[in-house]
Amino acid sequence: AAFALPAFASFEKDVITPAALEAVLNRKAPLSNIMMENDAILNVIANVKTVISNPVLEEALLKTNHGVNGIPCGESCVWIPCLTSTVGCSCKSKVCYRNSLDN
């Protein structure tokens, strides 16, 4: 049987890669007055996003052919907005992207 990647919408939760998680943890939200510990942040993220490996997400992005939207941030946004918005990502076509022209 052939291995097929599920569509983003077939996941029960949105997905995020370990690299995207690290970027979120390393960046403090500008409007946050409460400094949460990394463990607490990870618990919150685990309730709303499923952590998947980078190659799985990259393969899914290649199959959807939405490369013109920018640089993938390693996160989907089917149900939950981009957590990586703190590092400049935004939701386009159910995937969080960073504008390739921004530094």
Curated annotation (Swiss-Prot):
Propiece span(s): 10-69, 100-103
Example GO biological process: defense response
Transport is among the record's keywords: no
S-S pairs: C73-C89, C77-C91, C82-C96
PTM (free text): This is a cyclic peptide.
Cross-link (Cyclopeptide (Gly-Asn)): G70-N99
Signal peptide: 1-9
Similarity remark: Belongs to the cyclotide family. Bracelet subfamily.
Notes on the domains: The presence of a 'disulfide through disulfide knot' structurally defines this protein as a knottin.
Protein's recorded name: Cyclotide vibi-I
